[in-house]
Amino acid sequence: MFILLLAVPSRAQVVGKMFPAMEAQTAEDKVVKLPQDVQGKYTLLGLAYSKKSEDELNSWFEPVFSKFIQKTQGLMAGFGYDVNVYFIPMFTGINAAATGTAKKKAIKNVDPQLLPYILFYKGELKPYKEALDFEKRDIPYFFVLDPKGKILFATSGAYSESKMDKVEAVIE
């Protein structure tokens, strides 16, 4: 039983900590400083630092867009969420040189409605790997920040309804 508990990945160590300072850029090269520039609202961040984890990060795009970004119409107008959402592919080490190419590819291939919600990080991985408890390279990590930048919830991996329900519960 004890061994089983050790094998279960836990994001609990980061909950309650401030999200570490990160400077990233939009596809149009606008600098966004996290958590500084998102203070005042709840924020959902998705980070990926390998090609494989980027694919799982992408599995969140549509559900997150539908739930938190797309403006509700008709009877439900006014019942949407007022949250910041950013998906952040991280280009570190030798991959940092690919940032420009990735931006161009995103502009060409990503739904234009989603582009403002993608930030590109280029720089060191170690400070984030340590502060955010990244255990596995091939999965994305998600964090819900409170309006001051403190981590309220953390999860990882491909999209699932149960993960989305937990994200939603924290934001409500």
Which residue stretches match the model-derived regions?
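Bacterial N-terminal signal peptides
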Residues: 1-7
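Sec/Tat signal peptide C-region and signal peptidase I cleavage site
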Residues: 8-12
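Short active-site neighborhood of thiol/selenol oxidoreductases, capturing the structured segment around
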Residues: 37-61
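Structural microenvironment flanking redox-active thiols in thiol-disulfide oxidoreductases
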Residues: 53-111
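Thioredoxin-like thiol-disulfide oxidoreductase module
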Residues: 94-138
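Thiol-/selenol-based redox modules, centered on thioredoxin-like
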Residues: 127-130, 137-172
